[in-house]
From Swiss-Prot:
Record GO cellular component, one term: bacterial-type flagellum basal body
Species per Swiss-Prot/TrEMBL record: Brucella abortus biovar 1 (strain 9-941)
Pfam families: Flg_bb_rod, Flg_bbr_C, FlgE_D2, LlgE_F_G_D1
Protein name stated in the entry: Flagellar hook protein FlgE
Recorded name of the encoding gene: flgE
PROSITE patterns cross-referenced by the UniProt entry: FLAGELLA_BB_ROD
Principal location: other
């Protein structure tokens, strides 16, 4: 082995351990970074041709591998838009320039426009609420916005009201009634109109139904119910046209079909009227299946988006970009999209974050090993230098 080769090998070893120390330092610095994937320096030997009488020292080559496919721990948070993936898959996010990337960093919050953006400035992409898994494409995804879906006012047009009227009831005195129930409806502005529904027995199997506006007592709908004397089933009169036009609304078709006249108390089995007041979003929930559900002030819930997950054949071969994001490459394979809990993807966990997969204890151990190896390689170089000095001084 030549002295020059010895010194060259020592320098190669020092450079390799310096690379290892750099990855260890990066891992320690990002031990608390959400979604960070540990970097690891891998070594391979470089062998030079040798002869039986002379050995030529080679060197060591290094390559950095990222543990992109290794899941970090999951911790709970207080925000429903903090998202972690339990299992395979990556969130699809969009950068400021419109380029798309993959990430496990799910610390999303609404920006001033209501778009969900993570701490690195990348926007979460989602599919439509009714999108089929087979039709998913990256180009077809949109930024998830949680502020632009306020519920508009909707006037009432239809309702179902099913009751049992006691067969033992007697006709009341003039001007009286047997039973009364109040229902809520809405005009086209979303203003509430309370409807009082009166049931008055007028014959053995006949009831008069009167619908009045509770605010002024004006009758705005009426019908007569006739029941089968044997079975107590409704025979006719099961629809009431309630005219809300004078109050800024439409005609409400109130369906009483299914009502009965039988023994027992006055009971209500169904009372539903469509329509709603305008309502803003109170909060957002995200299901394990990726459904982004808006919770409105009036208690209504509506699915706004479904968050798909992406995966590649070899995740560890993706290119790492600043911000804990990854760019698919030729070595990693093509991007495949699917919804959580299907298509080989994991589940999304709301109110949680995936922590860094770097282990401080392991990193400190690696740092000590790299430090010792660096020192040993420096000793190799130093010894070669000293021997070279001896060789040079032989002429003196």
């Amino acid at each position: 082995m030549s002295l020059y080769g010895m010194m060259r090998t020592g320098v190669s070893g020092m450079n390799a351990q310096a690379n290892r120390l750099s990855t260890v330092a990066d891992n320690i610095a990002n031990a608390s970074t959400v979604g960070y994937k540990r970097a690891e320096t891998q070594f391979s030997s470089l062998v030079l041709p040798s002869t039986a009488g002379q050995y030529n020292s080679g060197s060591v080559l290094t390559d950095v591998r990222y543990g992109i496919s290794d899941q970090g721990g999951i911790r709970s948070t207080s925000s429903t838009t903090d998202l972690a993936i339990d299992g395979n898959g990556y969130f699809v996010v969009q950068g400021p320039g419109g380029s798309t990337y993959l990430t496990r960093a799910g610390s999303f919050v609404p920006d001033k426009n209501g778009d969900l953006v993570n701490s690195a400035g990348y926007y979460l992409l989602g599919a439509g609420a009714d999108e089929a898994a087979g039709g998913l494409t990256v180009a077809g995804l949109n930024v998830v916005n949680v502020n632009a879906a306020a519920l508009p006012a909707e006037g009432s047009t239809a309702g179902d009201f099913t009751v049992n009227l006691p067969s033992t009831d007697q006709a009341p005195a003039a001007g009286g009634y047997n039973h009364k129930t109040s229902l809520i409806s809405y005009n086209d502005k979303g203003e509430k109109i309370t409807l009082d529904v009166y049931f008055t027995k007028t014959g053995a199997d006949e009831w008069n139904v009167s619908v009045k506006n509770a605010a002024d007592g004006v009758e705005i709908g009426t019908t007569v119910l006739n029941f089968d004397p044997t079975t107590g089933d409704l025979v006719s009169g099961g629809n009431v046209a309630v005219n809300l036009g004078a109050y800024g609304g439409q005609t409400l078709n109130l369906n009483l079909g299914g009502s009965t006249q039988r023994a027992g108390d006055y009971t209500i089995s169904q009372a539903v009227i469509n329509g709603q007041a305008p309502s803003s979003i109170k909060g957002v929930d995200v299901g394990n299946d990726g459904a982004v559900v808006a919770v409105y002030e009036n208690g209504t819930q509506k699915v706004l988006y479904r968050i798909p997950l992406a995966n590649v054949a070899s995740p560890d071969r993706m290119t790492v970009v600043s911000g804990n994001i990854f760019l698919p490459s030729a070595e990693s394979g093509d991007v495949r999209l699917g919804f959580p809990q299907g298509d080989g993807m994991g589940k999304i966990m709301s109110g949680t974050l995936e922590e860094s997969n770097a282990d401080i204890a392991q990193e400190l151990t690696d740092m000590i090993e790299a430090q010792r190896s660096y020192t040993a390689n420096s000793k190799v170089f130093q010894t070669g230098f000293e021997l070279m000095d001896v060789l040079v001084n032989l002429k003196r």
